[in-house]
């Protein structure tokens, strides 16, 4: 996948799913996007950025990192498919 296509796909999915910029990487200033889902006793936060053509994602549950989801994905669509599965499994809606 070309970087331009990955960037366009990533931006489209970020906007479609209401992610917002929360920070920028120190070394290169790449925006880090996030979205938080809340309910009474549970918080789920997903942070994602695009490094070249590869999305990098982390998941935090109740403020603690969930290490099994700190990884990169081959393209924006596969990252957002995984996000959808995580959100659904946790009982939230995308």
Protein language model features and the residues they cover:
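Negatively charged, low-complexity tracts enriched in Asp/Glu with abundant Ser/Thr
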Residues: 1-39, 62-77, 92-94
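General beta-strand recognition
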Residues: 32, 45, 56-58
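Broad, structure-driven detector of short, well-ordered beta-strand segments within folded domains
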Residues: 41-51
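Glycine-rich loops and low-complexity Gly/Arg-rich segments
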Residues: 46-48, 71, 83-85
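A short, charged, amphipathic alpha-helix used as a generic interaction element across diverse proteins
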Residues: 76-87
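Short aromatic-glycine-(Arg/Gly/Cys) micro-motifs in beta-strand/loop hairpins
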Residues: 49-64
């Amino acid at each position: 996948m070309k970087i331009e296509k990955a960037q366009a796909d990533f931006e489209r999915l970020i906007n479609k799913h209401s992610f917002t910029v929360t920070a920028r990487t120190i070394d290169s200033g790449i925006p880090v996007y996030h979205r938080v889902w809340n309910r009474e006793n549970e918080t789920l936060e997903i942070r994602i950025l695009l490094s070249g053509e590869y999305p990098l994602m982390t998941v935090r549950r109740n403020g603690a990192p969930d290490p099994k989801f700190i990884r990169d994905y081959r393209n924006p669509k596969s990252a957002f498919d995984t996000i959808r599965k995580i959100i659904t499994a946790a009982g939230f809606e995308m």
